[in-house]
Amino acid sequence: MQGQGITGKKNAVVFCALWLLTFIIYLPAVKAGWVIDSAGWLNNIRNLSFWHYINNSQSGIPSLYQFTQFTTYIFYKLFNANPYAWHTLMVTMHAVNSFLFFFICNRLFLDSGIKNAFNIAIAGVLLYTVCPHISEVIVWEAAFHYLQGFMLILLILLCVQNFYHRQLKKYAWFAGLIYLCSTYSLEIFYLTPWFVLTLALYYRYVLNYDHSIFRKVIQWFFIPQLLLFVLHIIVLKAVYGWFFAHIGENLLQPFTSYICKPPRYIFHILFLGRFFPLDSRRQVYFIVGSNAGLIIFYNIFVLACCYIVSRFTKMTMKGKTVVLLFSWIVIAQAIIMPLAFPDMLLVYFDRYTYFLDAFVYMLLALLASYITNKYISIALLTVYGLINLYFTVKVNLLWKHSAYITNRLLKNFPDPGNKIVLLLDLPQNMDGIPMIGAEKEGQFKMMYKLFVNKNIPNKIYDVVAYNMITRDDGAHVWVHNDSLMKVTLNQWGTWWWYVGHGAYSYENEDYKLDMKDMGHWYDLHLKHPADQYLILLQQGDQWKIVNMKKRGEDQY
């Protein structure tokens, strides 16, 4: 059976609506995103040669990202670091992904003879667009390759679907070229052949398309992709000595570390687990990660699989489509299981679920269509969508506030004269939204040069950073003598960071840091006379200069 599809005009309306919705939702965060890895990327593209940048030779990460690096190089030449241009680009790429996913699913539902195919597909993609889990990918320029990677997968699936409708060789050539490019981008291309295979099996054995078409899909799409994948692994091994890109030794984890993540992601995505109070969230993570929780979850999973196998031939077309989407969720889960699970802050590592979210919400919309009373179905999806939208707006306001503070700190940095600068409490993030952070090489100095366009020859040290919770957070200092001070966070529930992890004691030629309590305070010992330093405290969006002659009281 072949669906009739929708008109080009209706497609244009859907795309424009998705773009406009995404643009409006993320407009508050338009100036955010140029932080942490994004700033490092911008520094690389401005200071490395073309070939060093394209080959990502400075990163130290075992990955082949030449296609991604090349495309970002082109966009940089077009936009420089203009926040409005980059924000529009990221919004547009997400709108394209949402539309492609809608188009593929709508056609899939039509081909399957599912009633209200358009309404189901549009409901699923709207849930995806308004969910709060995708903000990191849309706002943070360093997540460009997630937008690109998912787009490449969707374009290939569209080629396969088109081939089933019209057996033209050009679709196989397009898919092969796209997959070749994707092997030099984000590693989610590992999954593409399996998405292709499951879609091909569905059209052959569920929709009963001719076996000769299925054979050609295997020969012209699936097998060439497997060969390109093997070629990628060979090149990766030859260049870096690793068989798996990017994550390397992260594969060597306890088995339970892998299997506890799927139930946690269900809580995280479907039930907005990240927005639960920390204690409640940890309790849920503990329960689903316990032996009893895992036994229950995987017993349910196995029973569901057994039911699918035993009843598949008797299922309705809608039921079989549910199975296809379910299989795509399982495939998408597989690649993120070795990665760190985001169990603490908001937004942090949400990019890992960008493509998984799409399948989850489309499946949810399809399941909701089983409710016979359409008004109840619409009401439930609307309420659920509005709850998601509420948290998305909340997250985007955090992006906005964090960007305001970061930009103010850069703009209002005092003239250091000829002194050594110590930045005692840089903001690492705002409840998970990345900000500046503390790096050995000097993150603040690099960002100051990039965004204020001034080069300061002085030594500027990122002493430590901390995670902000509110816009007014900061720290205070108690000066003991002319070479020793105690630095304490003003608020509880935050902690000290250094080089992207929990802070620790260290020293260099200009000072020694003694971390007393990673969640509250540290001692700082100066190695030179106090008048050789400019010591700065961050309070909200302001810098405060520490007076080393003012002793016996807290300085805020």
Model-predicted regions and their roles:
Residues G432, G474, D482, N508-E509, ...:
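Intrinsic-disorder/low-complexity loop/linker signature
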